[in-house]
Each structure stands twice: as structure tokens, then as C-alpha cells.
Amino acid sequence: MNPLISAASVIAAGLAVGLASIGPGVGQGTAAGQAVEGIARQPEAEGKIRGTLLLSLAFMEALTIYGLVVALALPFANPFV
């Protein structure tokens, strides 16, 4: 395998994980902060807010997992060879 293609694949894998984690990380922090604020304002709605928060966090985390899958596919199942 060409070393240049191999090096570019490793760099692309790192960028895929890094860039795929930025958006969900910011979104999860914002969602958690808003959930805490909502629970502080309406403590009786804690269960509903927590359930909605956990579901939305799972959807956001899926984006990071997609980035990880792409990052693992680049070095091991290299489509550029």
C-alpha cells in the first residue's frame, strides 16, 4: 500500500472523529443545561424532562458513532486503494 495514502487515511480518520464529535458535544451540553434549568423551574415535570433528555442525547450520540464508524473504515477497509 502506498504510504502517502495510508498516512492520509489515518489523518482523515482523526479528522472524522474530531469533527463528528464537536456538534454533538455542544448540543449535548446545551440540552443538559436546558434540562437542568427546566427541572429547576418545574420540579414536578422531572420524569418527563429526563426521559426526553435521555432520548435526545442518544440521538445526538449516534452522530458521533457514525463518525467513529467512518474513522474505523478508512484505515482498515481503505476505499482509496
From Swiss-Prot:
UniProt xrefs under PROSITE patterns: ATPASE_C
Record-linked InterPro entries: ATP_synth_csu_bac/chlpt, ATP_synth_F0_csu, ATP_synth_F0_csu_DDCD_BS, ATP_synth_F0_csu_sf, ATPase_proteolipid_c-like_dom, F/V-ATP_Csub_sf
Superkingdom per UniProt: Eukaryota
Places the protein is found: Plastid, Chloroplast thylakoid membrane
A Pfam family recorded for this sequence: ATP-synt_C
Record field: transmembrane: 3-23, 53-73
Keywords for the protein's UniProt record, in alphabetical order: ATP synthesis, CF(0), Chloroplast, Hydrogen ion transport, Ion transport, Lipid-binding, Membrane, Plastid, Thylakoid, Transmembrane, Transmembrane helix, Transport
Bilayer topology: Multi-pass membrane protein
Coiled-coil residue spans: none
CDD domains: ATP-synt_Fo_c_ATPH
Family: Belongs to the ATPase C chain family.
Record's miscellaneous remark: In plastids the F-type ATPase is also known as CF(1)CF(0).
Purpose: F(1)F(0) ATP synthase produces ATP from ADP in the presence of a proton or sodium gradient. F-type ATPases consist of two structural domains, F(1) containing the extramembraneous catalytic core and F(0) containing the membrane proton channel, linked together by a central stalk and a peripheral stalk. During catalysis, ATP synthesis in the catalytic domain of F(1) is coupled via a rotary mechanism of the central stalk subunits to proton translocation. Key component of the F(0) channel; it plays a direct role in translocation across the membrane. A homomeric c-ring of between 10-14 subunits forms the central stalk rotor element with the F(1) delta and epsilon subunits.
Name the record gives this protein: ATP synthase subunit c, chloroplastic
Gene of this entry: atpH
